[in-house]
Amino acid sequence: MGEALNVMESVRSIVFKESENLEGSATKIEGYDFNKGVNYAELFKSMASTGFQAANLGDAIQIVNQMLDWRLSHEQPMEDCSEEERDVAYRESVTCKIFLGFTSNLVSSGVRDTIRYLVQHRMVDVVVTTAGGIEEDLIKCLAPTYKGDFSLPGAVLRSKGLNRIGNLLVPNDNYCKFENWIIPIFDQMYEEQIKEKVLWTPSKVIARLAKEINDETSYLYWAYKNRIPVFCPGLTDGSLGDMLYFHSFKKGDPDNPDLNPGLIIDIVGDIRAMNSEAVHAGSRKTGMIILGGGLPKHHVCNANMMRNGADFAVYINTAQEFDGSDSGARPDEAVSWGKIRGGAKTVKVHCDATIAFPILVAETFAAKRKELSHIRCQV
């Protein structure tokens, strides 16, 4: 009898193990109460205490707001800083430098308009994307993209001249219009290369195309107007590459491109410019907001390695880390490379960016637009 009681007491001590007290040190999980009516601000605020990816999105909102709220005046002046850097007004004017990276599919989607809003109001400082993130923005100024379905048969769509991007449809005519628009611009750029010795980099090409499109629905137009650099090291990986390929036969030597390759684009100039954006951030903190993975994610992170890592990082993507891909890697992996600082504020939101990013912007950049409009225009 006594032995049985001892066994039961041992079992009870295992099952009913005493807990650490989390009261006051951890967020209590509770969702939004719709009995209080529909209040979107409170609904979004409640995500932080909902759990799972809603909580991660809540953390992302908090971190981006920390990026936007940071001023150099929050830090103690260094012993070797200049007189200007000691000036109180100057220190209050210095904000976090924000790098925004995103993949092309997001420009194909309606997230393009969210990106345009940020660039239009100078809420980000550096943009990195893929070739599709450039061309899709320009093409949408010429012709629209339409909603389709993920399950539409590829062979049927091909017979109709319709290209599918997930559940979006892009008529092939859009690319024909793009060719008609861009080739004369490439002709002009080639003439400037020959006669004026202009050395084109991807970012210079992008700025020129943005100037020529002259359309306020384009985020590239606003980047050009606001002098926000847009980097794309993979500029040839898309329709832009197709156009450059065709143009090289038109202006270059079709039989011996070594003698005359046509329009030349220098990628080394841009890697210097991109890395310099991080290196010369100086006393500013840097923040990374990266939508999707691949080239933009790595390019932004790698540039920040040049300054011993970013101070804030928000990733939004659905990629998994277990195949070793950079796309799926969590922020902590970037810490091991020196791309994010050890004490940085970071989060990865495992979610489709078309869902998460507009909510994030609503609760951060858009909510703070009035207070940001003055100070970020001075940066």
UniProtKB/Swiss-Prot annotation:
EC nos: 2.5.1.46
Keywords, ordered alphabetically: Hypusine biosynthesis, NAD, Transferase
Functional description taken from the UniProt entry: Catalyzes the NAD-dependent oxidative cleavage of spermidine and the subsequent transfer of the butylamine moiety of spermidine to the epsilon-amino group of a specific lysine residue of the eIF-5A precursor protein to form the intermediate deoxyhypusine residue. Also able to produce homospermidine from putrescine.
Required co-factors: NAD(+)
Gene Ontology MF annotations: deoxyhypusine synthase activity
Pfam family for this entry, one: DS
Subunit and interaction comment: Homotetramer.
Single GO cellular component term: cytoplasm
Binding, spermidine: E135, E136, D242, H298, G324, S325, D326, E333, A334, V335, S336, W337, G338, K339
InterPro entries: Deoxyhypusine_synthase, Deoxyhypusine_synthase_sf, DHS-like_NAD/FAD-binding_dom
Gene coding for it: DHS1
Name of the featured protein: Deoxyhypusine synthase
Catalytic center residues: K339 (nucleophile)
Protein species of origin: Nicotiana tabacum
